[in-house]
């Protein structure tokens, strides 16, 4: 019987399993609920993984009792060694027919392995933000990812918070706003459906919902697209903060990553990247300044990319590589380049 290789994209909200043949063809897929073991516990996590793989095996016309050759799991929280060991033990002990071999890695590593063969940077800007560097040898380092209380700079939450803070500080006469606050102030009252600043406090404290608060970023983006100077200023600052995350990991980058035809590959994940044109000026400024300050002449170009396929593909590739099998990947199909720059 033909060998099958599996990959799992484990998200905080949704998860996906892909089954591939040994020549890299996708034979079946299955979707499921969150497999973030920090949120749901290890027991529920492995049950959901087994259930999704079982469903995918049936779709592929395979006996569920025949184990996969390997299963590569790209999970949020996949960098915690103790948690990973516990997950492996649970998978092996409870579901002996699931797979012969397991490889568990981070969501960032699975994403970059879907887009490029050798590694690169994953730069996340959704509700929160994070920057992870994956070198060709698989080693990782990063900047950010500590949540909204400690940072999340350049994220949707950060953009929304900056906008609200600038308005509050300007009205209080604590700090002069860089531009007129009129548009952002009215957008803020409209979005939160309150008549004044006191009404905003409910959304900041008693009824705080991070996703809802971050959603105000969309209104700032609309204002920026309409030409509001303050909205444009905030997005430029967000671009700068995201660029500084890349600058922060430059000293850790294997020089090999600068030498490919793409230059440094940067995989952009999250909805804030839909507003790239608004982020661009600040992003380029931060990279240009950081490159000069660090005298990083080998960093001569970069390419921004977006995934077109699930990071379960990268998970499957890493899982197969772990047991010495190379799964063919068409990286030009898996990810699309949307911006390139040479210094």
UniProtKB/Swiss-Prot annotation:
Catalytic reaction list: N-acetyl-D-glucosamine + ATP = N-acetyl-D-glucosamine 6-phosphate + ADP + H(+); aldehydo-N-acetyl-D-mannosamine + ATP = aldehydo-N-acetyl-D-mannosamine 6-phosphate + ADP + H(+); N-acetyl-D-muramoyl-L-alanyl-D-isoglutamine + ATP = 6-O-phospho-N-acetyl-D-muramoyl-L-alanyl-D-isoglutamine + ADP + H(+)
Give the matching InterPro entries: ATPase_BadF (IPR002731), ATPase_NBD (IPR043129), NAGK-like (IPR039758)
Residue ranges annotated as coiled coil are none
> CDD domains annotated for this entry?
ASKHA_NBD_NAGK_meta (cd24078)
Chain positions with Phosphotyrosine modification: 205
Q: Where does ATP bind?
A: 13, 127, 214, 271, 275
Keywords, sorted A to Z: Acetylation, ATP-binding, Immunity, Innate immunity, Kinase, Nucleotide-binding, Phosphoprotein, Transferase
Which family is this sequence assigned to?
Belongs to the eukaryotic-type N-acetylglucosamine kinase family.
| Protein's name in the database | N-acetyl-D-glucosamine kinase
Q: What is the lineage of its organism?
A: Eukaryota, Metazoa, Chordata, Craniata, Vertebrata
Q: What's the name of its gene?
A: Nagk
């Amino acid at each position: 019987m033909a060998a099958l290789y599996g990959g799992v994209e484990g998200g905080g909200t949704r998860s996906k399993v892909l089954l591939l043949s040994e020549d890299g063809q996708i034979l079946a897929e299955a979707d499921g609920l969150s497999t973030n073991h920090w949120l749901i516990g290890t027991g529920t996590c492995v049950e959901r993984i087994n259930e999704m793989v079982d469903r995918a095996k049936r779709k592929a016309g395979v006996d569920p009792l025949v184990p996969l050759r390997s299963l590569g799991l790209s999970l949020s929280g996949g960098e915690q060694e103790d948690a990973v060991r516990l997950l492996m033990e649970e998978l092996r002990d409870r579901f002996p027919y699931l797979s012969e071999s397991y490889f568990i890695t981070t969501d960032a590593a699975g994403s970059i392995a879907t887009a490029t063969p050798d590694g690169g940077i994953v730069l996340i800007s959704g509700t929160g933000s994070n920057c992870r560097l994956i070198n060709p040898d698989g080693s990782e380092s990063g900047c950010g990812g500590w949540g909204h209380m400690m940072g999340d700079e350049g994220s949707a939450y950060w953009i929304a918070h900056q906008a609200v803070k600038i308005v509050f500080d300007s009205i209080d006469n604590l700090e002069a706003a860089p531009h007129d606050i009129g548009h952002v102030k009215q957008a803020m009252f409209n979005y939160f459906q309150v008549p004044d600043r006191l009404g905003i406090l409910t959304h900041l404290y008693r009824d705080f919902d991070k996703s809802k608060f971050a959603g105000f970023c969309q209104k700032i983006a609309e204002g920026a697209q309409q030409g509001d100077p303050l909205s444009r200023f905030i997005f430029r600052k967000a671009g700068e903060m995201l660029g500084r995350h890349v600058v922060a990991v430059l000293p850790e980058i294997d020089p090999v990553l600068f030498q490919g035809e793409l230059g440094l590959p940067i995989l952009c994940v999250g909805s804030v990247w839909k507003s790239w044109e608004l982020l661009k000026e600040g992003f380029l400024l931060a990279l240009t300044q950081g490159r000069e300050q660090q005298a990083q002449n080998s960093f001569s170009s970069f390419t921004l990319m977006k995934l077109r396929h699930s990071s379960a593909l990268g998970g499957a590739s890493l899982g197969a590589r772990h047991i010495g099998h190379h799964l063919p990947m068409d990286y030009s199909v898996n990810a699309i380049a949307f911006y390139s720059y040479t210094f």
